Each structure stands twice: as structure tokens, then as C-alpha cells.
Amino acid sequence: MRWELAQEQEMFRDSFADWLADHASSEAVRGWLDAGDAGPFDQRMAADGWLGVGFSEEAGGQGGGLLELALAAEQLGYAAAPGASWLASVLAAPALAARPDVSAAVLEQGEAAALAVTAACPPDEPGPVVAKDGALHGTVRGVLGASHARHLVVPVWADGQCTLFLAAAGEPAISRTGRKLLDRSRSAADVTFTGAPARPLDADGRAVLAEAALRAAVLVAADSLGAADRMLRLAVDYSRQRTQFGVPIGSFQAVKHAAATMLVAVESSRTITYFAAASVEQGGGESGLHAAAAKAQVTATAEEAADSALTLHGAIGYTWEHDLQLFYKRAKLNAYLFGTPQVWNERLASALPLLRGR
């Protein structure tokens, strides 16, 4: 099956891709990584109005849904653009529906938000933070986008129930310690609450986190799709330029087969990702299966594409000066971001009717 986008969706994808080509070239990305500060990119993205795409106008957005967000994530992955603040805000924003002032600040003014869950696990897994007398206590390891967030949505689990709290990240009782990641285009930090004041949000915590898990699965898969697509193009271009025995290495059958395998993987991943995004947006009974399949299959496929692309390039592909290393590291991190393929395959298997009946 081949997924066909609507004309408006194609126009959005192409417009965002053109914008990224102008504002997030490989040279610009390296500059931000060298400086350790992607703030200029985040600020420009907010100023040019891209943060509101995928959210309703009532919430302060510009319309669209999860499929539009997936198209944006795909292009961010294709450019290896800094994406931690964007993805963190996208996952936190639905929890802010009861606080339209904060929601508008995030989507319209670019005040970054983050969901205080560990980026190593699906967002709906219980966390360590507890609430006592309206104050938060505990440490959450590796929170995506926390370093630059102004608003933190903090899940507190008790007796199987989840309450979401909103905290200002700049509170003195909240400390953030940055973590080093293989892929420096994303950022994460350990967040410690030592009696931090917070207010509960009027939201169904379990439902919000369950939705966040599905959205995270789809959007990380879309990012991997974009990275894999870019690595395919880099590998094909390099195989046309690099010569061995007096001919381009792209003329060798083994290289052709490797490139063809990557192409099939990219196109199948595209259909899986788009279908999962549409399914989660519509909220069907099998949307969880589709999201799990996308996260498990697409991120694993992108990892394989990264290895193939690096093999075709040789050692030069991992040097700082070559673009391939940006996408290689991105694909590798995506496989672990919000749960490994194994974790999502287990969720997929446990939800199948054959196993549910046992």
C-alpha cells in the first residue's frame, strides 16, 4: 500500500522543507552543535510560526493534526535539525488544554515546555515524582528538552492513578543537570524536585500520558524516516563520486543491492509512519498497534540504513566534517528514544488477540 498525502499536506511538507534548507543547513547545524546552543534555531522556528502547526486554533495553534506533526518531524530528521525543544513541547502541549494561557505561550510565543518523563521509556510508564502538600519531590532522569524548558508538566503516580502538575522550570526548588547524548542535535537533562511548588492540571493524567506515548512513538518514527531518507541520498551520491578500479563504486552490483534495499526500507517506513499517524489521530481501536509497529519497525530499519550508509561511505562517513555522521547518530538515538524496538514489539505482541486470550 502507498500512502497519498492531501495537496495541503504536500504543500506544508514542501514549505517546511524549504524553510529548513534556508535556516538549518548542515553548516548551521554544526555551528549550533559546536556552540552547544540550539536556541537561535528554536527562536526562529517560533518566530516564523511553525510551532502552532498540528494544534487547533482554539489551543493557540494553526490547525492540522498528528499527520502534519509527523511530516514536520520527518523534515527535521532529514535536516538533522535540533528537535528536542520542539518534540518536548509537542508532547507536553495536550496536557495544557486546561491552561489556555500557558498553551498559547508555548504554541504562539515559543515558551518551551517539557513532559517530565524519562526519555528512555514510553511516556506512560509510572515515574518517581511524589507530591506532598502541593510540592513535588523526586528526580526524573533524562528528560527530553528539559534544559531549555520554561514549563514542566510533571506526572505524579499514586495507587495506579496519575495526576499531572504544572511547574515553572525556573523555580529554585527545581534543578536541571544536562546529560551528554550521542546525538548532540537533541538534549536531555536530569530534573530534580526538592519541594517545588506546582499546581494540578484539570486533565485525565493516564489518558494524557497514554496519548503522549502514541504520539511519541509516531513522531520519533517519522524523525527516523527523515534521517534514513537523507542517508540513502548521501550514500547514492557518494557511490556515484567515489571510484575504485577506475569506475564509480555505484556500478558494483553489491553497492546497487545495498542502495536498493535501503530504498525499499525507506518507502515502506514512509507508509507505516503516515498510516500510524492517521490512525492515532482518528483514535481507532487499533491505533496503539499501529503506533507500536511504527516505532519498532521504522526506528530499527533506520538503524540498519545507518549501518549500510556508513559501510558504503567507509570511515569518512563518521568524521565530523561529513554530513553522514549527523544522521547516523540521530538514527541510533531514535531507536532508544521513548523505548527501544524491543519494548514496543512487546507492547505490540501483548495487544494481539491471540495473546490476550491466554
Segments and roles (model prediction):
Residues 125-137:
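Cytochrome P450 C-terminal beta-domain/meander region
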Residues 108-122:
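A short, Trp-centered hydrophobic/proline-enriched beta-strand micro-motif
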Residues 62-63, 82-89, 106-107:
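Active-site nucleophile and cofactor-binding loops and adjacent substrate-binding regions
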Residues 1-77, 135, 214-358:
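Alpha-helical interface subdomain recognition
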